[in-house]
Amino acid sequence: MEALVYTFLLVSTLGIIFFAIFFREPPKVPPTPTKRIK
């Protein structure tokens, strides 16, 4: 049962970090082709 809690905490932390990094970047990216998006 603890493994489930630890997995949930890890996934939620990674998701929050990715969310913050993704939305912290302002749309001031130089005009490059949009094919860089994975």
Swiss-Prot record:
Transmembrane segment boundaries: 3-23
GO cellular component term, pick one: photosystem II reaction center
Membrane-topology annotation of the record: Single-pass membrane protein
Intracellular or extracellular location(s): Plastid, Chloroplast thylakoid membrane
Main location, first listed in the record: plastid
InterPro entries: PSII_PsbT, PSII_PsbT_sf
Keywords, alphabetical: Chloroplast, Membrane, Photosynthesis, Photosystem II, Plastid, Thylakoid, Transmembrane, Transmembrane helix
Coiled coil, from the record: none
Disulfide bond annotation, renumbered to this chain: none
GO biological process per UniProt: photosynthesis
Protein role: Found at the monomer-monomer interface of the photosystem II (PS II) dimer, plays a role in assembly and dimerization of PSII. PSII is a light-driven water plastoquinone oxidoreductase, using light energy to abstract electrons from H(2)O, generating a proton gradient subsequently used for ATP formation.
Family that this chain belongs to: Belongs to the PsbT family.
PANTHER family assigned: PHOTOSYSTEM II REACTION CENTER PROTEIN T (PTHR36411:SF2), PTHR36411
Listed HAMAP family: PSII_PsbT
Subunit structure: PSII is composed of 1 copy each of membrane proteins PsbA, PsbB, PsbC, PsbD, PsbE, PsbF, PsbH, PsbI, PsbJ, PsbK, PsbL, PsbM, PsbT, PsbY, PsbZ, Psb30/Ycf12, at least 3 peripheral proteins of the oxygen-evolving complex and a large number of cofactors. It forms dimeric complexes.
Protein name, per record: Photosystem II reaction center protein T
Organism whose genome encodes this protein: Triticum aestivum (Wheat)
